Amino acid sequence: MTIGAPRVLLATCANVPDGDGDEQELVEACARQGVVAQWAVWDDPDVDWSMADLVVVRSTWDYVEARQEFLRWARGIDRLSNPAEVLAWSSDKVYLHRLAEQGVPVVPTTVVADAEALTVDDGTELVVKPSVGAGSVGAGRFSSDRPDATILARAHAADLQAHGRTVLTQPYLERVDTGGETDIIFIDGVFSHAVRKGAMLPGGTVNAVDGASGDELFRPELIEPRTPDTVELRVAQSALAAVPGPQPLLYVRIDLLPTDDGPVVNEVELVEPSLFLRSAPGSVDRLAEAIARRARTGTDRG
């Protein structure tokens, strides 16, 4: 550890070298905790990560195009939040199967082996997406209202597989169009705040898999504060408890979608989620306090 004020590097990507706009106050908030924090691009060869008392993964949004390189980088960091093994688990959405096996309610998810076996059944909508992805990059929504829906869904799945991606399918849950998505954020294992996020996949959308730095990733989102109910909190906490590895984690975002039978988990975001700090007064200071504790105590070894 350094002598004097702890030093923290906030890992980001080259597209946003000074971090996501939502976190522009984080460096100053860390300073209020007596911590020197600065942004650094995760794949910049000139960065000396060993100089930091703690490296915090934040807006590394381009990692999906170089996941193995990103995980090698993470495993090479001695003190990393969140830890490398957690990043590996969370960066591939096949974890939804593991959550379901542990009794966590999740969006029904199928791994596609043969793209030509896909069908969009009458009266349904199907989401086809890569298991590794950021935002809605690579995701397509196909409605049986179109006579060529099955053909289009198969073509999209085949394109994803041609890019080396594992393909997942999920039913499109119509209630998200009116109720939105509820994103629940935990800081240092404790519930911090939640937001409502509007639907991000309009009907008929087919996003390219190679657009991780394009419009799909940086598209403006409809965000507003939301108070989760007890059922939503319980589901989110059950998902958090099912995450393998050390707990508590510095930051967690659990994304829930509404159904007639209650909320279900769509994603467990442990790599580089937007935490919507601007939507929750005090949340940036809570995050900075948690970062300072870890930087000083030597927790979160990669």
What residues fall within each predicted segment?
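Active-site nucleotide/adenylate-binding loops and adjacent lid/helix of ATP-dependent enzymes
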Residues: T2-T12, A74-I77, E85-G179, L233-R234, ...
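Conserved N-proximal alpha/beta basic substrate-recognition cap immediately N-terminal to
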Residues: I3-R7, A14-P108, A113
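Short secondary-structure junctions
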Residues: V35, V104-P105, G123, V243-L250
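A short, glycine/Asx- and small/polar-enriched loop/turn
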Residues: D48-D53, V120-G123, T178, P258-V264
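A short beta-strand motif that forms the metal-chelation/ATP-contact edge
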Residues: A52-V56, K129, T182-F186, G262-P273
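Glycine-rich phosphate/pyrophosphate-binding beta-alpha loops
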Residues: W61, S136, M200-G203, E269-S279
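Phosphate-binding site of ATP-dependent enzymes
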Residues: P147-P244, V264
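ATP-dependent carboxylate activation and anion-phosphoryl transfer catalytic cores
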Residues: V190, P228-G302
